Amino acid sequence: MKNYVIHDLPDYFKQYKKSIKNPKKFWDKIADENFVWYQRWNKVVKFDMEEAKIEWFKGAKLNITKNCLDRHLNLRGDKTAIIWEPNNPDEEAQHISYKELHERVCKMANVLTELGIKKGDRVCIYLPMIPELAVTMLACAKMGAVHSVIFAGFSASAVATRVNDCEAKMIITSDGSYRGNKAIDLKGIIDEAVEKCPTVEKVLVVKRTNTDIKMKEGRDFLLDDYYPKASTDFVTKIMDAEDPLFILYTSGSTGKPKGMLHTTAGYMVYTAYTFKNVFSYRENDIYWCTADIGWITGHSYILYGPLLNGATTVIFEGVPTYPEPDRFWAVIEKHKVNQFYTAPTAIRSLAKESSEWVEKHDLSSLRVIGSVGEPINDEAWHWYNDHVGKKKSPIVDTWWQTETGGIMISPLPFVTPTKPTYATLPLPGIQPVLMDEKRNEITGNQVDGALCIRFPWPGIARTIWGDHQRYKETYFSAFPGKYFTGDGALRDEVGYYRITGRMDDVIIV
């Protein structure tokens, strides 16, 4: 991200002020200087908050996979793009270079094409955390198919609900997955789900556990039968800025899952920019986010954000407590991880174990540690800061949502002074406001209210797949002219934000 790294606090305030005063100019420059476009946009942003219609970089032509892979081949072809750390520590890790990842993605795109997938088709992906998960997502994006990743822990009925909602033509799954000392029959779950999915024509099966599985003739296809002979050349599809990139379902606390639709250009620009700044990423760093790719954190900060920056990203198949409760710390030491991004749930459960599990590992490579998924409580923050960060690596306590596409409020390492349990300050381009129950904006500090965002940002989801009315009502009706996050927040005496929890049942007087 040329010219857009924030170096210190005065620089943050300067950039932030610029981004609020003239958001169009701010994002125009970032998009122009840091990405490869087939054609430039004729309008930076166009929006109607009442109708919940938002468009960024309208008129632009691009492909996100070209920006994640192809453009790095000259300078970073031999650099490791993905380090895959398997569930079992005795199994060898894979180091996949940008060149090899590009070849794998082209081969996969050719396989999908051979099996009848075209631009605009929806492909559901139900895979464990194996390299093929990243490869299939990037292949879909390269060929213009819309991926919808379903977390490989969901039941057959949860899978069927999501597959039917987006009318997927294909499901990509594996024979099974490993979780700790258990092998799980993923193909069996998909067989049950597909019985209720009339739009699914084909199921593509990746081998992982090599267990015996039933294959239905004419519907089920083994990747191994197609992949070896597939070409490593594939003509990248040229996409419009607002073409769908992926649908990701968020359960939320009420009603059926919402298929959040993210589009190509805005999501690309926002995830790349936020990754670079929030994790203080430098050229040869090793970055590890422990989330599952089935969640938005994995989409934005395991796959797209890091690869857009030419980074090395770790994909971990296992769990934090297998074979012992020091697996996270062992992986950090083994791969000399510089940035580590995990959830408060994991931090709390690992904090219950003896601190000897952490102390026995060399974590000196760590420079930044992060938290995501929910507000981190005071005790967990201090344990993480003291034992993992050794009081040297700043904690980036990030607030964002499936709907926002990328991080919205967060400290920037070595820039923003941290404060336990506070997400601190908004990133450039993000205008948080607190609202009261009478829909009035609450000004000043030491106040709390409903957290809304005043102006659109490039990463915002554009709609709920197939139900724009629900999107409008959920996010834009409670506080007209603003995006309502569904969260409450407080603003302290210096303007730092702390998320106080969900407000889904907010009553407007």
PLM regions: where:
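Conserved ATP-binding/catalytic segment of the ANL
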Residues: 443, 452-509
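ANL superfamily adenylate-forming
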Residues: 89-90, 170-241, 353-354
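N-lobe entry segment of adenylate-forming
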Residues: 1-96, 100-103, 107-110, 189, ...
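Conserved AMP-binding/adenylate-forming core of the ANL superfamily
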Residues: 65, 82-138, 155-160, 215, ...
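Conserved pre-ATP/AMP-binding loop-to-beta segment of ANL
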Residues: 78-80, 204-205, 216-249, 256, ...
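Conserved AMP-binding/adenylation subdomain of ANL enzymes
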Residues: 268-286, 296-339, 353
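Gly/Ser/Thr-rich phosphate-binding loop
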Residues: 308-311, 338-342, 351-420, 431
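ATP-dependent adenylate-forming carboxylate-activation enzymes
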Residues: 127, 148-164, 176-185, 266, ...
